[in-house]
């Protein structure tokens, strides 16, 4: 799929320039690697040092073996940082392509909400409202009200 054949998400007015860069990066990645049933979501995230890390959803033949784009991006970020350095994710944007050939910002699944909030509870995570398909920023920890916290 080429980027030219998919309509980009309009940058929300409430989105910072830094987060808009994540949105663009995620859309460009997914336009390049999208494959129906295999790679349908891309994530771009920023760490406190300003670097952008990306990941793409990897669908396995056994559903349990599938890995979400958010986890892949977080693993890439972890691997790029020196040992002992906090992950320090500040923002996360994930996108998928709608059947109509349009990009859409999506919320992380429940497992990824747990993972993101475990490692970076104060990160901004962009989600889309259920009632209006409107992208909004939320604090990672707010994605899971009354989340139990593990002591690491």
Residues of each region from the PLM?
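C-terminal binding/interaction regions
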Residues: 2-32, 36, 85-152
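Short beta-strand scaffold segments in enzyme catalytic cores
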Residues: 40-47
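Hydrophobic "anchor" residues
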Residues: 51-52
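Hydrophobic alpha-helical segments and helix-packing faces
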Residues: 15, 19-22, 45, 55, ...
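Short, solvent-exposed cationic patches
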Residues: 69-94
């Amino acid at each position: 799929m080429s980027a030219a054949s998919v309509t980009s998400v309009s940058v929300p007015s409430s989105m910072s320039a830094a987060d808009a860069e994540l949105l663009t990066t995620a859309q460009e990645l997914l336009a390049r690697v999208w494959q129906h049933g295999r790679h349908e979501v891309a994530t771009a995230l920023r760490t406190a040092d300003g670097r952008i890390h990306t990941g793409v959803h990897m669908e396995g033949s056994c559903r349990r073996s599938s890995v979400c784009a958010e986890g892949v991006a977080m693993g890439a970020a972890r691997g790029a940082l020196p040992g002992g350095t906090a992950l320090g994710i500040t923002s996360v944007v994930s996108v998928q392509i709608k059947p109509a050939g349009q990009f859409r910002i999506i919320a992380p699944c429940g497992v990824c909400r747990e993972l993101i909030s475990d490692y970076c509870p104060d990160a901004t995570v962009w989600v889309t409202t259920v009632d209006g398909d409107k992208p909004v920023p939320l604090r990672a920890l707010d994605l899971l009200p009354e989340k139990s916290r593990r002591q690491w």
